[in-house]
């Protein structure tokens, strides 16, 4: 009879048990990230603020956001070197302080439009630094078996906070834009203090599983080339999200003549789906190849945007949010886990920074491009453009070279004669070939560690 310690009798751990097993600095990171996101009042309503409070046109606001969003690119690029030179903790604290300083100026100063772009640049340098530094900290402290769960928890916390933040921000903005900015700044600085106290400066484990050796540079080919191409291709799944952040508030308030509070409802629906289904999806993605997961993510993105495009209404806005959020969950877990599983520990920070750079690039080009389309052709072509983007991503991931997780490789047989040399060479060749196929999903590390 199997005992409680037998292989087949062990019950799956609850998410609370798995969360408690994570290192304390990671738990602190997840809590502060949630609180910081819940206090992120400004960014989701930035376009509305610039149009209604500062009197800018939609195209001008889009251009200003695009110019200011170069700060995301700079912040993403700075994150890797700062993490390497000063540590993950200092990078996180600096990110929050810069964000607070930029928003302080943006919320209190009146001037020419270029001053708004400059202040937004400073704020978004901080925002661009935070995400890659947080992902690098997770890669440092979480074991390979814990990584998919850790990135899922991080994603859920961020999105739950984003569901609360815009809702509170909308209420604050209805009272006063100054209150909206003040709340954002105070919460960010409090989170910086908590991270400074509870997260150690040096978080490199020094015990990471060996990965493929290679040069320190990020190259289009070579050992880490497949990781680089995956990160770059993820742009096609990031761009629709940025497009929704820019276009949806304007579409809701101008085309549907609804309250800006509905934008907060959309973020809340997004968060409800993430919280309700995120951990369930994390358990199931272990059963599927990475390529399949990425294709399904693109299909869900396309389906959700099709609902919004062809049935443009308040009901369609809410229904589409449920669908595309599922695709967002899958991609947001698969990509950083793939980086952590396949990149040398000393290069993880740079690849996480590159992942953040892709997000920053989307924030740079998407609002400006969609703003021009909206200004010249109206809202519906903007929705058409966003629908096409994940379809392109599906085509790219269908042909991209993708490796399986090293942790999911099958174990060697327990007994049996050694193969002949020719058979051994053939098996070795087959194994090397299989590693480039669409192998098991990144969460297979959880199953293989059981």
Where are these regions (language model features)?
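Hydrophobic core of transmembrane alpha-helices in multi-pass small-molecule transporters
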Residues: 34, 114-129, 235, 316-330
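Cytoplasmic helix-loop-helix junction between adjacent transmembrane helices
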Residues: 119-160
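Helix-to-loop junctions at the C-terminal end of transmembrane segments
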Residues: 75-87, 277-290, 374
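Juxtamembrane intracellular "pre-TM" segments in multi-pass secondary transporters
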Residues: 2-23, 200-232
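Helix-loop boundary and gating motifs at the non-cytosolic
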Residues: 15, 19-69, 226-267
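Interfacial helix-cap and linker-helix signal at transmembrane-aqueous boundaries
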Residues: 50-51, 82-83, 171-174, 252-253, ...
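C-terminal ends and interior cores of transmembrane alpha-helices
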Residues: 97-111, 300-312
